[in-house]
């Protein structure tokens, strides 16, 4: 049984007359059946073993205790995937309701589209393991500690890409995958600027991967050094929404710093 999902801090943005996006945090309550509360019921309620007069059961004061549930790394990954898949679709429905659009998702093939309107849809979420994220401390976690951010973009014009990231890109990963022209510029920045721009580059690359269906290695190796001046300006100015056009692809790029989200549309 899937846990109950809840969306928090939903933020809607209209990027232009043909493009809308939404971001949110999705949390899940732990399903009762995973607690294994009733595994030992036969022995616990054997009146002979407990030496209890069953007639006196109604006079017994009962104390209930549910311990925290710890999940293995594999279980966490599985729960995250399930939670993210349901979470982005829940956010899509919320955005459709906001736009007063009565439609459903066709996710048979990429790019995803809405069935009736044929609008393009793209999802993103945090929490999935990927080579870009900094290593986090390992160990078991309670299911209720799992907290993921989700994002969705709808475009009635053409395929769009979106990427939401909370972790920086490790410098060794950037040097391995990024284009040599990008690395040359990144090396001239302060460490703080470098980490921020490297992360934005990753998000742009991920977004274009979703649009053009590049392989991961192919998409990460693309040269977007011509965009880096705009990216550097965006982190200096810190606007709530930063939009500029990529002259080479003729796509627009939007950066929402508060939501840690990049959209290519």
Language-model regions: role of each:
Residues 1-265:
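Core catalytic alpha/beta fold that binds nucleotide/phospho-ligands
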């Amino acid at each position: 049984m899937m846990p109950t999902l809840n969306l928090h801090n939903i933020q809607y943005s209209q990027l232009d007359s043909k493009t809308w996006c939404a971001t949110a945090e999705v949390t899940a309550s732990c399903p009762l059946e995973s607690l294994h509360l009733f595994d030992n019921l036969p022995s616990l309620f054997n009146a002979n073993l407990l030496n209890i007069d069953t007639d006196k059961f109604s006079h017994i004061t009962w104390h209930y205790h549910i311990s925290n549930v710890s999940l293995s790394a594999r279980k966490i990954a599985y729960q995250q995937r399930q939670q993210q898949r349901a979470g982005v679709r829940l956010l899509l429905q919320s955005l459709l309701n906001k736009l007063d659009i009565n439609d459903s998702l066709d996710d048979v093939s990429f790019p995803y589209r809405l069935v009736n309107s044929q609008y393009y849809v793209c999802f993103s979420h945090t929490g999935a393991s990927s080579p870009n994220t900094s290593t986090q401390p390992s160990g078991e976690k309670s299911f209720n500690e799992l907290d993921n951010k989700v994002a969705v973009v709808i475009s009635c014009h053409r395929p769009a890409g979106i990427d939401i990231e909370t972790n920086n890109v490790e410098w060794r990963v950037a040097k391995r995958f990024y284009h040599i022209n990008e690395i040359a510029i990144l090396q001239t920045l302060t460490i703080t600027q470098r980490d921020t721009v490297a992360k934005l580059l990753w998000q742009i690359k991920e977004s274009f991967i979703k649009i053009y269906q590049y392989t991961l290695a192919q998409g990460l190796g693309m040269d977007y050094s011509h965009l880096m001046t705009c990216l550097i300006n965006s982190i200096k100015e810190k606007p709530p929404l930063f939009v500029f056009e990529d002259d080479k692809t003729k796509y627009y790029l939007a950066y929402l710093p508060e939501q840690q989200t990049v959209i290519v549309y």
